[in-house]
Amino acid sequence: MASANPETAKPTPATVDMANPEELKKVFDQFDSNGDGKISVLELGGVFKAMGTSYTETELNRVLEEVDTDRDGYINLDEFSTLCRSSSSAAEIRDAFDLYDQDKNGLISASELHQVLNRLGMSCSVEDCTRMIGPVDADGDGNVNFEEFQKMMTSSSLLNSNGSAAPPST
């Protein structure tokens, strides 16, 4: 009887059973490449790569900042558990961003937003899209970068009960 190759059967944070502490620890150890009991920002990049999502160093530092509740600059097992619970939604947000970022330059312009919304059957003008971008555009460049998009998508005040974007208030 052949045993499964452990290299091809590794669980990922998105598939780990949160109710099984042993499985969680096994996945944590897989990403804690130097075995120091904590995941660095560099090792965190490997976690997201395993889930099929690549983040810039700035984005990884932001994730670390949000998950690192004890503020030691690393992710421990408890913090990793929290990250695993939220990681599928993070991957979904990245996928949604990529859908809107038509030219793949890392920014969503009013024109790109207009194209996608019209394709989805929503009637709006480029000017409407420019107004939608305004409150989200923290750096004032007229576009939405991933960080701004992620902040918008995770802000409960901008989402309605079914998880879709609420129209901007006037």
Swiss-Prot record:
UniProt entry keywords in alphabetical sequence: Acetylation, Calcium, Metal-binding, Repeat
Annotated residues for binding of Ca(2+) 2: D68, D70, D72, Y74, E79
The UniProt record lists the keyword Metal-binding: yes
Gene Ontology annotations for the cellular component aspect, listed alphabetically: cytosol; nucleus; plant-type vacuole
Chain sites annotated for binding Ca(2+) 4: D137, D139, D141, N143, E148
Residues binding Ca(2+) 1: D32, N34, D36, K38, E43
Modified positions (N-acetylalanine) in chain numbering: A2
Database matches in SUPFAM superfamilies: EF-hand (SSF47473)
Induction / repression: By touch.
InterPro entries in the record: EF-hand-dom_pair, EF_Hand_1_Ca_BS, EF_hand_dom, EF_hand_pair_protein_CML-like
Ranges where the EF-hand domain occurs: 19-54, 55-85, 88-123, 136-159
Pfam families assigned: EF-hand_7 (PF13499)
Residues annotated as binding Ca(2+) 3: D101, D103, N105, E112
GO molecular function: calcium ion binding
Source organism, top-level taxon: Eukaryota
Function of the molecule: Potential calcium sensor.
Name recorded for this polypeptide: Probable calcium-binding protein CML27
Lineage of source species: Eukaryota, Viridiplantae, Streptophyta, Embryophyta, Tracheophyta
Gene name tied to this protein: CML27
